[in-house]
Structure formats: structure tokens, C-alpha cells
Curated annotation (Swiss-Prot):
The keyword Ribosomal protein applies. One of its GO terms (cellular component) is cytosolic large ribosomal subunit. InterPro entries: Ribosomal_bL27 (IPR001684), Ribosomal_bL27_CS (IPR018261). SUPFAM superfamilies: Ribosomal L27 protein-like. Pfam families: Ribosomal_L27 (PF01016). Keywords: Ribonucleoprotein, Ribosomal protein. One of its GO terms (biological process) is translation. This is Large ribosomal subunit protein bL27. One of its GO terms (molecular function) is structural constituent of ribosome. Belongs to the bacterial ribosomal protein bL27 family.
């Protein structure tokens, strides 16, 4: 059997692109509507008040305010606390 596979052939050359997942805005940070809060695969964090979920499970702000992480029914949830008419 050949120990070399042949001309212009390789078994290497594969690498996946980084996915840049994780929490992008942490608790207490102020966000605007549309800002991404968490990039994730699956619902590690669930959307709460003022937070939407994209088709790839990305959580984003639906309104301006401060990010708040908490729990509801044994699930980790992300809420937006709207600032009281400070603007």
C-alpha cells in the first residue's frame, strides 16, 4: 500500500470559523433597542421582559434600558429594566 496518497491530495486543511458566542452586554449595562445581549446556541438564557429572541436563539433588546439577569421557574432569564423617564 502507498504511504503517500498521490499528487495534489491532502488530508488536512480543515478548520472552522470562530462563532463569537457569549454574553455581549452584562448585568447593569445600558442598552438601546436592537442591541444584542447574548449570542448562543440553544436557549441557555431565556428572554424576559423587553427582550426578544432571534431564530438562532440570539437575545436582543426590544427597548432601551438596563440589562438584568435573573431566574424564573428554574430558568435563567434576561430582562430589560426601563429607566424611569430620565431621557
Amino acid at each position: 500500500m502507498a504511504h503517500k496518497k498521490g499528487a495534489s491530495s491532502t488530508r488536512n486543511g480543515r478548520d472552522s470559523n470562530a462563532q463569537y458566542l457569549g454574553v455581549k452586554r452584562f448585568g447593569g449595562q445600558v442598552v438601546k433597542a436592537g442591541e444584542i445581549i447574548v449570542r448562543q446556541r440553544g436557549t441557555h438564557f431565556h428572554p424576559g421582559a423587553g427582550v426578544g429572541r432571534g431564530k438562532d436563539d440570539t437575545l436582543f433588546a426590544l427597548e432601551a434600558g438596563a440589562v438584568e439577569f435573573g431566574a424564573r421557574g428554574g430558568r435563567r432569564v434576561v430582562n430589560i429594566v426601563v429607566a424611569a423617564a430620565a431621557e
